[in-house]
Every structure is written in structure tokens, then in C-alpha cells.
Amino acid sequence: MKFFIDTANVEEIKKVAKWGVLDGVTTNPTLIAREGRDLKEVIEEICSIVDGPISAEVISLESEKMVEEAKELIKIHKNIVIKVPMCEEGLKAVSELTKLGIKTNVTLIFSAQQALLAAKAGATYVSPFLGRIDDIGSFGIQLVEDIVTIFTNFGIESEIICASIRTPIHVLECARVGGDIATVPYKVFAQMLKHPLTDRGIEQFLEDYKSMNK
């Protein structure tokens, strides 16, 4: 499984990049707005930190304008992937961008049907949102499992980015059912590091070492 980090905070990206586990980054307009910085400036800095796919989202909701935005975004760096919302205009844009050889990530996927349409249109990645589905009393992981099964059945090459990750259990479940990628917030990465028995074991090692050197 590959790990992306879901943030536009460069300090968070730098921290996790040093662990040697990052394969890419996903951003969106909301995350970039929180940083209070110019979009291009933020994306350029992220690309200098992580050598992997960097998803940057278009703002327009008309396919022609999405394509125009995408052409500008890919000028920033060769690793840019164009993030497009799941909608009719989005699919039109994905189809056109695929013909131009531009990689795409279709976001806001909430059903396997949507994922199938996005893949058929040529999406490089599809992003089902686990946490938001859990929020309405359903099972986000079932969606990921359904998409994995369908893509496997038909040899579909679009990769599945498990998004809206809220807990380490979400990451574990995605890995269990075969999600290709988990895009994980910094907070959840930090939680994945921790286990009380690990902490206790380290404390015990230190106590034993000190007692040996008295």
C-alpha cells in the first residue's frame, strides 16, 4: 500500500517525509486556504519536498474551464495530478485531460457506480471518501471493498485512493480490503506511530539500562 499525506501544511509534510513513508500528497482548495498562502507557491514547495504524485484541485465547475486550469497547474511541476470533482462536467474534463496525457484524480466519490464511471472516463486515481460515509451511518470501508472487487473483475488500472481517513483503523481496513493508496492526515499518521505497549517497552528498556549502569 502507498501512503499519501492529505494536507497543504508544508511543515507536516516535511515531518512525515523524513520517516521515509510518503509516496505522494493530496491537497484541496480548503486545505490551501487554511495556510493563507498563494496556491502556486504552496504547490511548488510541496513538490520540492515529495517526489511523487501531488494532487492539485481545479476550482471551476465547467469542463472547458477545468481543462484550462489543469493546463496551468501542470506547468508548476511534472508530478502534478489534476484533482477533479465527481460530476458530469468533471467526467468530461477527465476524458479530455486523459487524451492530453494529463493525470487525474476524481474526488468526492461516494458510490461504486461513480468510481466505475470515473475509471471509464480515464481517471488515473479515484478517491472514495470513507469518513464522510461513516458519518451518515453507513460503512465507508464497504465502498472501498466494492470498488476493489469491481476494478479487479475488469482489470481496471485506475488506482484507488482511500480518502476522508479519520482514524488508524480506517487505514488498516483499507489495506485489508486492497485499497491501493491511503491519503492520511498528519494527525492520523502521528496516531499510527503510537501504541501503549511500545511506549511501555521503551520505558522498560531505559529503566533496565539505567539500573545496569549504576
Curated annotation (Swiss-Prot):
GO molecular function, one term: transaldolase activity
Domain of life from the UniProt record: Bacteria
Reactions the enzyme catalyzes: D-sedoheptulose 7-phosphate + D-glyceraldehyde 3-phosphate = D-erythrose 4-phosphate + beta-D-fructose 6-phosphate
GO cellular component: cytoplasm
Pathway: Carbohydrate degradation; pentose phosphate pathway; D-glyceraldehyde 3-phosphate and beta-D-fructose 6-phosphate from D-ribose 5-phosphate and D-xylulose 5-phosphate (non-oxidative stage): step 2/3
Subcellular location: Cytoplasm
InterPro entries assigned to the protein according to its UniProt record, in alphabetical order: Aldolase_TIM, TAL/FSA, Transaldolase_3B, Transaldolase_3B/F6P_aldolase, Transaldolase_AS, TSA/FSA_arc/bac
CDD domains named in the record: Transaldolase_FSA
Active site as annotated: 83 (schiff-base intermediate with substrate)
EC number(s) from the headed UniProt entry: 2.2.1.2
One Pfam family here: TAL_FSA
PROSITE patterns in UniProt: TRANSALDOLASE_1, TRANSALDOLASE_2
Broad EC category: transferase
GO biological process entries: carbohydrate metabolic process; pentose-phosphate shunt
Alphabetical keyword list: Cytoplasm, Pentose shunt, Schiff base, Transferase
Biological role: Transaldolase is important for the balance of metabolites in the pentose-phosphate pathway.
Family: Belongs to the transaldolase family. Type 3B subfamily.
NCBIfam families given in the database record: fsa_talC_mipB (TIGR00875)
Protein name as catalogued: Probable transaldolase
Organism (species): Clostridium tetani (strain Massachusetts / E88)
Gene (name only): tal
